[in-house]
């Protein structure tokens, strides 16, 4: 916990610098700092200076904090405690409480979701141990062309908190929470508290609708939406401030392009909003100068650098998720399209509920602005653009199923809600923030005339927020309990297996239970040459060792079949225990 406190202090050094030097909103500063640190670490990692970059960033944060406190003490008569109270809003208190609750519950949380083993968790472990980006020689990471920004930041966190799966989850949560905190940027929550509570309610809706990704793992699908909305909020608030809006688009759009492959879609949305405000509010004599639109080029630089690195360092033709289109499977492609359309219209999916809420909010907005035709026209234009973007996102998701996903996964529309909900969250968040901003401009919070009623509303909205957070935490506790009692991956942890020395040992794993993924072996044994035994004795000759993970009946049946004896959980050399006939076969 003390290491976490120090880490937060180091981060706050940068936050205080942004607030003091550039007058950036305290709500927006945290995600700008985290994203900026990730991009800086990425740039150094390209130069093979990953570890020096992390130490430089970490200790520089303390120097900046010391300078800030020194300057503050000279320019203000306030004590540090008074300054803290003045800058620490009730929203900050709620988010601090959220973070502390999450840390308490997540510090012992294991990685659960499949993708944590196949790439996200494995990539963080690789960065932690090897302190460099992967190359084509590092076969242990199959998905090594995945953008690394969030993994690099999580690695930065675990380098100073200590390596554990719980610390990985806490690091990922820090990025998500910082992005959600930025939603409050355009609102004056001190003057009009109700708007702050409505934004909290929006976040609660996100918690409740998220039925697949959750924040107790390392998946980044929801983070894409939160970062995009954070960017929208910041760009709107600083639409007339070219310096800060340029900083926002360079950092957040650049970061989005390195969060996930589909992040470039949302980066382009941020760039489009930035260009719109630039064209509207910048009165420069030369409308299309290179200097004016230089931030756009800088925004695309991290993505271009990563693509160049992938092109130079990897043979991507071997990846199952590389872009392709097999014309011989047109009948299957047609089935995928039909199934995608039906699934998109299914009223029982969270993404459809989100679309329904968007339509409801648009209709309500049109109704309440009926007397203001000019404003109503703006809302209609905004809504039209919003639905066009959502349609484009759905079409791009369908194209991913058709061209960039293995057929066995595509035909089942694997992770449909997880992918579509990202776009829906962006749409729902955008229209909700617009509606709350309209509400803020029409409602004053100064009068005591309905103070009793307001307290009830505020209490109710805070209650809903913490109930939604509790829903996520209870879900995490249930998942953890099931995972511990039924999963194959957790057997590695029970046996204390967590190798940190990269190796090429060929290990055949004998185990039975749920979450039967080979990738858990890659993570814990730290070798690319490990697989679960599927019942075919002919494969045993290809391995150096067998690992018996448990004493379950199905596992021991396989052990008896291969060795002719019962073996306790542990490692065994194939030549010592396996029937010679199987080795020579």
Predicted regions and their residues:
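Membrane-embedded, hydrophobic transmembrane alpha-helices
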Residues: 1-85
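Extracytoplasmic catalytic/substrate-binding loops of multi-pass membrane glycan-assembly enzymes
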Residues: 109-123, 129-153, 163
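Hydrophobic/aromatic-rich transmembrane helices and adjacent perimembrane loops
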Residues: 125, 220-228, 265, 407-437
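Membrane-lumen/periplasm interface segments of specific transmembrane helices
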Residues: 108-111, 153, 276-280, 286-366, ...
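Membrane-embedded, lumen/periplasm-facing catalytic core of multi-pass transferases
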Residues: 466-520
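Hydrophobic alpha-helical membrane-interfacial segments at the cytosolic entry of transmembrane helices
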Residues: 87-101, 251-253, 284-309, 383-389
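Signature aromatic-anchored transmembrane alpha helix within multi-pass, membrane-resident enzymes
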Residues: 244-253, 267, 271, 291-301, ...
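Membrane-interface alpha helices of multi-pass inner-membrane proteins
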Residues: 40-45, 245-261, 265-272, 343
């Amino acid at each position: 916990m003390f290491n976490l406190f120090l880490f937060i202090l180091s981060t706050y050094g940068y936050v205080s610098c942004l607030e003091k030097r550039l007058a950036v909103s305290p709500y927006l500063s945290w995600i700008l700092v985290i994203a900026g640190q990730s991009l800086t670490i990425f740039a150094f990692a390209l130069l093979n200076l990953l570890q020096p970059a992390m130490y430089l960033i970490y200790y520089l944060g303390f120097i900046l904090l010391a300078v800030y406190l020194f300057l503050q003490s000279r320019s203000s008569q306030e004590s540090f405690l008074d300054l803290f109270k003045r800058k620490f809003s009730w929203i900050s208190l709620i988010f601090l409480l959220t973070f502390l609750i999450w840390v308490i519950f997540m510090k012992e949380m294991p990685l659960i979701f499949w993708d944590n083993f196949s790439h996200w968790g494995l990539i963080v472990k690789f960065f932690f141990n090897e302190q460099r980006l992967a190359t084509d020689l590092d076969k242990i990471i199959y998905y090594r062309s995945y953008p690394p920004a969030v993994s690099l930041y999580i690695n930065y966190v675990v380098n100073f908190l200590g390596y554990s799966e719980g610390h990985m989850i806490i690091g990922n949560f820090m990025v998500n929470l910082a992005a959600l905190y930025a939603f409050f940027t355009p609102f004056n929550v001190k003057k009009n508290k109700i708007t702050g509570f409505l934004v909290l309610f929006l976040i609660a809706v996100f918690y409740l609708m998220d039925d697949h990704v959750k924040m107790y793992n390392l998946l980044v699908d929801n983070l894409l939406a939160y970062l995009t909305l954070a960017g929208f909020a910041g760009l709107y608030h600083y639409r007339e401030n070219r310096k800060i809006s340029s900083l926002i688009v360079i950092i957040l759009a650049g970061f989005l392009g390195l969060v996930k492959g589909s992040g470039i879609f949302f980066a382009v949305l941020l760039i489009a909003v930035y260009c719109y405000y630039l064209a509207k509010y910048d009165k420069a004599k030369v409308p299309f100068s290179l200097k004016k639109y230089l931030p756009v080029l800088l925004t695309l630089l991290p993505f271009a650098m990563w693509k160049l690195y992938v092109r130079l360092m990897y043979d991507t033709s071997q990846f199952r998720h590389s872009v392709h289109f097999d014309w011989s499977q047109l009948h299957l492609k047609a089935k995928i399209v039909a199934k995608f359309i039906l699934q998109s219209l299914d009223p029982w999916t969270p993404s459809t509920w989100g679309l329904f809420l968007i339509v409801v909010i648009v209709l309500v907005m049109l109704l309440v602005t009926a007397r203001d035709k000019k404003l109503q026209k703006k809302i209609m234009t905004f809504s039209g653009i919003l639905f066009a973007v959502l349609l484009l996102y759905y079409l791009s998701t369908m194209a991913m199923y058709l061209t960039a996903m293995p057929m066995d996964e595509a035909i089942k529309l694997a992770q449909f809600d997880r992918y579509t909900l990202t776009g829906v969250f962006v749409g729902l968040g955008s229209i909700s923030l617009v509606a709350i901003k309209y509400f803020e401009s029409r409602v004053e919070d100064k009068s005591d005339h309905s103070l009793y009623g307001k307290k009830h509303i505020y209490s109710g909205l805070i209650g809903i927020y913490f109930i939604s957070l509790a829903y996520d935490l209870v879900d995490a506790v249930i998942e953890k309990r099931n995972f511990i009692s039924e999963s194959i991956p957790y057997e590695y942890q029970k046996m204390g297996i967590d190798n940190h020395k990269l190796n090429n040992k060929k290990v055949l794993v004998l185990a039975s239970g749920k979450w039967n993924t080979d990738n858990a072996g890659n993570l814990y044994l730290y070798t690319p040459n490990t697989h679960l035994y599927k019942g075919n004795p002919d494969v045993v000759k290809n391995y150096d060792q067998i690992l018996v993970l448990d004493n379950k009946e199905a596992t021991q049946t396989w052990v008896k079949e291969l060795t002719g004896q019962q073996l306790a959980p542990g490692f065994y050399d194939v030549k010592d225990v396996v029937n010679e006939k199987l080795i020579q076969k």
